[in-house]
Amino acid sequence: QISTSTWPMSGDEIQRALSQAKISNNAQQKVIDSIQNALKVDNQTAKLDLFAETDQKNIPQAFGDHTKAQYVGSLELNAGGENWDGKLRVNAEKDPQIDNGQDVNVEGSYIAGKLWNQWLIAGQMPTYWGPGHDGSLIRGDASRPVYGFTAQRAEQKAFDTKWLSWVGPWQYQAFAGQLDDYEAIPDAKILGFRLTAQPLPYLELGASRILQWGGEGRPESWDSLWNAIKGNDNFNDGDDDKSNQIAGFDGRLNLQPLLDVPVSLYGQYVGEDEAGLLPSKKMYLAGADFSSSYKNMPYQLYAEWADTRTNGDAKGISYSHYIYQDGYYQHGFPLGHAMGGDGEMISVGGDIRFDVMNRLSGRVMYAKVNQSAAHFGDDQINKAFPEDDKIKALDLTWTHYLKPTLPLKINGWVSDSDRQGNDAGASIGIEIPLDRDIFGF
C-alpha cells in the first residue's frame, strides 16, 4: 500500500508500488492502466497545455486544480535520469484569479537530484499534506506554489534494523521557501516538516508543522530560527515571538484488512498555537471513502467535513497572526484549506473510470466561508472569500484520452451564493505532447 497523503510524490515510490501491485480483476487493471497513462502524460519530453474557462469558478478549489487564471497556455519540457530530474514549465496567463502581478511565470518548474534514497528539489511546485480529498488544514494547493527547496525520501521503505522496522513504510518532507508579495512582512519565509508512517498495514499516521518566520524587519539569525523550531517563542511580544506556527496530526484507517470492507476512515486536526506541547486553538477535518467496481468499472466515493474555525468558534484566529498580518495566505489565497480560515464545509464526491480512456469525477458541497469577516472589516486577509457567505455547488469533470498521451478535460459547475447569487460555467483543457507520433509522422 502506498501513502498518498504527502505531495509531491516520488516517482520512485509510485513505480515501486506499481511493480508490486497484485491485480486480481479487470477493475483493478483499469486503475493501474489509468495511473500508467497519467504518468506517461506527465513525463512527456515536451508538451503544450491549453486551458480556458467561461468564468472564474468562485468555489473552494478541488485538490489538484492548479489553474489560477481564466486563460492559460503552458509549454513544458521534461528531462531526467536515474538520479536527477527536471521540469521547465512556462505559463502565460490572462485574467488571473490569483493576481501575482505577472503575465508569465514558471510555476510547476523544478530541478532535482537524488542521493542515498533522498531527493533534494529546488523549484515552485504545488504541495499538499494530509489525507483529505477536498482540502488540507495545514498545507493545501489552493494558492500559487511557493518558491523553495524540498527534501524527501525516494522510496518509502521500512527501516532494515529490527529496532525500527516496526515503524513500517515511512516518508518525510522538509520544505523551506519564501512567500511572494507578502506585504505585511516582505520576504517572509515559510518552513515546514511532515512525517508519515504505516506501523500497521491498515493504519497510516502523520504529523506536520509549519513556521512563518523572518522577513523584512524580523530576526533571521540562527538563534531566532532555533528558538522558533524549539517552540520557545510563543509570546505576545513582537521582539520575543519569532514566528507564526501551525502544527497538527492526521491519520487514515483502512478497514479492508480488518473487516473485509472497502472503506477508509480519515481525520486531521491542527492548532494555531501549542499548549502542553500539543496543538491548541484547533481546526478539524474528517471523512470516509469507499472503493468498489460496477460492471468492471472501478469507482470511489467519499464524504468529507472540514471546520477551520477555532475550537468551533469564528474568532478571527485561524490562519491569522498579529505580526504576520497577511495571515497564512499568499497573494491573499490560503496556504491551508481552500476555503481559508473560519469556515465550515461538507462535501460528497467521487470518480468512476468507464475504461482506460474515460473518467468522470465530481462533487457536491456546502460551505460557510469567512465567518469572521466582520472582525477584519476593510482589511480582509482572505481574498479567495472576502465576505461571510454560504455557497452550494456542483462540480463535474470528464477526462477523455483522445490518445493514450493526449488527455482532454471538460469541467462544468453550478453554484449558489448568498452574496453573489447563482453562477454557472465551464472550462476545457488539453495537454498536447509535442512529438512526431501524435501528428502521425
Residue ranges and their predicted role:
Residues 36-92, 120, 170-174:
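Transmembrane beta-strand segments of Gram-negative outer membrane beta-barrel proteins
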Residues 195, 400, 422-441:
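Outer-membrane beta-barrel "beta-signal"
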Residues 68-166:
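Well-ordered mid-protein domain cores that form the structural environment of catalytic cofactors
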Residues 3-7, 25-26, 34-46, 80-86, ...:
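Short loop/turn motifs that connect adjacent beta-strands in outer-membrane beta-barrel proteins
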Residues 148-325, 341, 346-348, 353, ...:
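Signature for the C-terminal beta-barrel architecture of outer-membrane proteins
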Residues 52-58, 81-83, 92-96, 115-117, ...:
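Transmembrane beta-strands of outer-membrane beta-barrel pores
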Residues 60-63, 93-97, 134-139, 179-181, ...:
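Extracellular loop and loop/strand-boundary signature of outer-membrane beta-barrel proteins
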Residues 1-65:
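N-terminal periplasmic/intermembrane-space "pro-region" immediately following the signal or transit peptide
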